A protein has these predicted regions:
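Extracytoplasmic low-complexity, Pro/Thr/Ser/Ala/Gly-rich segments
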Residues: 2-80, 206-219
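A small/polar (G/S/T-enriched), proline-flanked helix-loop surface module common
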Residues: 37-170
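A short, solvent-exposed beta-edge/loop patch
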Residues: 136-219
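Helix N-cap and loop-to-helix transition residues
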Residues: 13, 27, 94-95, 199
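Generic detector of well-ordered alpha-helical segments enriched in charged/polar residues
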Residues: 18, 22, 101, 111, ...
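Extracytoplasmic/periplasmic, Sec-exported soluble proteins
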Residues: 23, 79, 89, 105-106, ...
């Protein structure tokens, strides 16, 4: 079971948080059959819509976060029926902050705020892409504790659509976002399937790597 790692003496530094993220995140060569691109990088600061979602849900301010690092991006397949995967590691000041954020994010209010955020994001994207393929209706399903033996894990499964000018559905985009917490960190795996979902075997392989590294390292 992934539990709470004992904190190091004194506050966690940015350097410690980044080093932990680097030790846990997926890296080149981890996923056979996938090609990796770009280097691990610090995630951009949340935009206006994302900040509005956090305020709506009563979530923890991202200003309190010590570091959020995104892994290299893995891709496989053609443009249609392609697959994309990446991991993200967030480090916060204490396990209590992570626990509070995790509890709030699973409340019905937070789920409603997330749906509102996605709708607003899609509307803005469609305006920017006028005349090109539009984002259509979507569905969201949440699965609590999807990882056996792992406390405080979650899965958010999003099924998006892409529309032709006629309004007919051209493609489905399947986006699975897995997450779990350990000590002052939250680890996520995002798996995007174009045309069909990313195989569960590929998701399981990536998740096992992240779990093993999270248990083998401490902030």
């Amino acid at each position: 079971m992934v539990g709470v790692n004992p904190p190091a003496s004194g506050p966690i530094t940015k350097a410690q948080a980044v080093a932990y993220a680097h030790a846990v995140n997926l890296r080149a060569g981890d996923l056979p059959g996938f090609t990796s691109s770009r280097s691990e990088t610090e995630a951009p600061k949340p935009g206006q819509l994302a900040l509005e979602e956090i305020r709506c849900s009563g979530g923890v301010s991202p200003a309190r976060r010590i570091a959020k690092m995104e892994s290299t991006e893995f891709s496989s397949g053609r443009v249609f029926y392609g697959k994309v995967m990446k991991s993200t590691v967030e480090v916060w000041p204490t396990p209590a902050v992570v626990a509070s954020s995790n509890v709030l994010s699973h409340k019905s209010r937070a789920r409603a705020c997330f749906v509102r955020f996605l709708k607003a994001l899609h509307e803005r994207t469609n305006q920017e892409r006028k005349g090109r393929m539009q984002i259509g209706p979507f569905t969201i399903a949440t699965v609590p504790n999807p990882l056996p033996g792992v406390s405080d894990s979650f899965l958010t499964a999003i099924n998006e659509t892409r529309l032709l000018r006629s309004g007919a559905i051209r493609a489905h985009i399947y986006r699975d976002i897995f997450g779990f917490t350990t000590g002052p960190a939250e680890i996520e795996l995002e798996a995007i399937g174009i045309g069909r979902p990313v195989p569960t075997s590929a998701e399981a392989q990536a998740l096992q790597l992240l779990l093993d590294r999270a248990m083998a390292n401490t902030v």
